Amino acid sequence: MSLARGLERRLEQLVDGMAARLFRGRMHPVELANLLIREADLALHILPVGPEAPNAFAVTLGGEPAEAEARDAVERELAVAVEQTAWERGWRLPGPVRVSLIVGSGPAATAAVRAAFVAGPLPPWARLLPPGRPPVEVCPNRAVVGRSSQADARIDDAEVSRRHALLWREAGGMWVADLGSSNGTHLNGEPVAEVAEVVDGDLLAFGGPSFVFRSV
């Protein structure tokens, strides 16, 4: 799966902007982004909730040192490339994506990538809004909704199973699946038998409690 065209354009613009010197004689930023994504794909962990990808990348480039400002800009864009690919492919990430560019010895055209899993807080990509109560934030992709203290989106209600349902983003959509809960998961009043697509404003019920689904 190739990078989205809009993301490719942003990476290509780095070559014409302040990062031009950084990429002179080196791997093109689009190629570098694809290299990171391949490394992430090779390092996937398959969890009970689905695939989890590494989120910390150290990229060693050969050649002459580059300005810190240009390096920072490239690191940000490469992180966005990994994040957007994770959403598109349905990968879970253990924390925010961090990319570090290190200029070392060796030919300028070489690049080496080390990938790691580093836990950290993630911003919410959706919220579950119950009537008259605080919202429940959905932060990681492939988030477990449930009563357990280990659930990603915790609902403290006896009618909710410890691991009740799964919420995630993939292939441009948002999805819900029941995890074999005791009281079932319902989408707009209909039981979720396997996997169902969720859109902004839908009504989700986990056992008894109901929530309006809002993407962030």
Segments predicted by a language model, with ranges:
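Intrinsically disordered, low-complexity acidic Ser/Thr-rich regulatory segments
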Residues: 1-3, 7-158, 168
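Forkhead-associated
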Residues: 135-208
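Edge beta-strands of extracellular beta-sandwich domains
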Residues: 210-216
